[in-house]
Amino acid sequence: MQRINCSQGTNREVSPTDRTQALIRPYRPSDLDALYRICLLTGDDGQDATSLFSDPRLLGHFFAAPYGLFEPALAFVAEDNAGVGGYILSALDTQAFEERLERTWWPHLRARYPDPPASAPGEQLTPDQHVARMIHHPWRIPDWLAARYPSHLHIDLLPRLQAGGLGRQMTKTLIAALRGQGSPGVHLHVPGGNQHAAGFYRHIGFTELPATPDELPAPHLLLFGMDL
């Protein structure tokens, strides 16, 4: 599954940010609906995907909710006076996370959302059908990537929180938490056309990694990793 300061270890105190007047704080169970909402509002390559999906929670079923439910210690949100407006989510051990989803998350979603016919070309699928296909056939991390960069992350911020260095602060917060839990490395995927995001990750210490199309969730994605 692919879609960012604590001072040391697993220190999870709330951290103020500058300019945005937002707080980075640990995820709470009551934030689950906010994860779904933000995932949808940023689901069209950072833009609002509400008009694209018949089921407004479908995107969050895949990209957001499992992290809050199964990896809450590695989930942080950004909250301002208007409420929660961003999150950073991670899995410590991607292979173990994938296995857990196979046991406890995907089965009920597969029963709810039919798998589109294998013969249906991707370009003919609706956005709902694209996500349904991913639910039935989720990408699995290659062994070589899991060996060095076993953790992965997603970050999404609503437009009102996209300035002032908040993404960088959230990334630092998560990286500190991952180090505190002993992760040797973290990876993420970025759309190949999003050079702004690619530049951001390079700037904060990620390195682009070579990967074949078969080793990526989708051929248009770039793979980045960071040793911790």
Where are these regions (language model features)?
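Conserved active-site alpha-helix within GNAT-family acetyltransferase domains
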Residues: 148, 153, 164, 168-169, ...
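Conserved GNAT-fold acetyl-CoA-binding loop/helix
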Residues: 43-63, 101-114
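Active-site rim helix/loop that mediates acceptor-substrate recognition in acyltransferases
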Residues: 53-75, 81, 138
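Conserved acyl-donor/pantetheine-binding loop and adjacent beta-alpha core of acyl/acetyltransferases
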Residues: 95-154
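Conserved GNAT acetyl-CoA-binding A-motif
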Residues: 149, 178-191
